[in-house]
Amino acid sequence: MSAVLAVEAATLPVGWYWTTMGEIAEVVGGGTPRTTDPANFEIGDVPWITPADLSGYTEKYISHGARFITRKGLDSSSAQLLPAGTVLFTSRAPIGYVAIARNPLGTNQGFKSFVLKDGVLPEYVYWWLKGSKQRAEALASGTTFLELSGANAKKLPIPIAPLDEQRRIVAEIEKQFSRLDEAVANLKRVKANLKRYKAAVLKAAVDGRLVPTEAELARREGRSYENAAQLLGRVLEGRRRQAKGRYKEPDTQYTGALPALPEGWVWASAEQCCASVRDGTHDTPAYVTSGIPLVTSKNLLDDGIDFDNTKHISVADHHEVSRRSAVARGDVLFAMIGTVGNPTEVKTERPFSIKNVGLFKGDDDCLLAAYLCHWLSSPVLCAWLRPRLKGTTQKFAPLGLLRELPIALPPRSEQDRIVAEVDRQLSTVAAFERSASAEIGSAQLRRAILDEVFRLSRGSGSPRSAECS
């Protein structure tokens, strides 16, 4: 008995015992037939599982993967036909995926599978191994990636309970996981409702229904006001004077019908409303270990910029990119490729460069950056933009399209009120979304359930009394 098992043995109740997987199962590896021989795969009828088949797989049992092999492929490789009830355990890339064979099947060399002896339930071993990833990794070795050898797979510890107790433990775990899955489903419904509510808030904002319009307030108070058309005209005239005859008039031609706007609002292009509309580099500068962050579409989040997962470029390359698109606090970024959108207001002084990201430089006299962010997230703008995106396999918004984006422009003081009310309502939504996201798919909670049920089963408690908190 190993030192670990000797220490643990004292914690087990009567009838239980610590052992290893090698004592309760035959440990079987897998293999891959030669892929250059079509006879190994064509019209194969032997299910053949790889670790990729278990990536994202949430069922307990598996009957087949993406590929089948032939009997010739099975016989000519180190793959073996495993009986139904075999517990499959990935031993590399990554370690720790688990499933039970629903029917006879084979695996590639990324598995150490356990063909169990009598007296041990596959489901009991399945749940124990679901919580044994760290134990397995501690026994693994390798430089490029960790791999659990067959010899070390045999050393994996497991507490064995009497058969009836195994059945009770399995039933308790599955009851708790069923409750957890129901809770997760409810949380997903909550998130979907929050998303719809957020869209409704943004639509109400750009429909002029979220706050009293400036036109309404002016009538109520018996005063005049600067409507959006006057505001835009004043700003554009100021730019013309400043440019001294060199001002290039923005394109104001929209394609497709646009909805009617509230009194005092006007349709304008992004190029009219903003000081400038540019984009980041489309090249890929050389990456460095430590340097200036290069922000791409995937780094734009609802609540800011994800600097934790950016690549870095040299200071010299940053200066070169900044000649085209220098980012400053108060600018609005917009993903141009892949998941187009995710508008984000820059709220940091930290220097960074952008790649495949649109850059809207605000003109606070005309358009508040926070209002622009909300408008670019609105269902109205998204519906206008979606059919105009370019590309087939991967959609993208070219710079010209970003400059033409229609903006529902309210009077300037009305923008402030809209932003304040949208932020107030969406701050509550964001708090709920963060809470829901933290719970959905919580691996820690699932691990805690496994640990708690096995702990209570080995201690003075009963597994039937274990509850999710």
PLM features per residue range, with description:
Residues 2-5, 14, 91, 105-112, ...:
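A short glycine-rich beta-alpha junction/loop motif
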Residues 2-32, 155, 159, 163-170, ...:
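Non-catalytic DNA-recognition/assembly elements of restriction-modification systems
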Residues 3-9, 15-60, 73-77, 241-244, ...:
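Low-complexity, Lys/Gly-biased intrinsically disordered segments
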Residues 50-52, 66-130, 149, 296-297, ...:
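A short beta-sheet element
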Residues 55-68, 299-313, 347-348:
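Short, basic/aromatic beta-hairpin or loop at an interaction surface
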Residues 125, 133, 166-169, 372, ...:
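Interdomain signal-transducing alpha-helices
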Residues 190, 197-248, 461-465:
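Extended, domain-scale alpha-helical bundle/helix-rich regions
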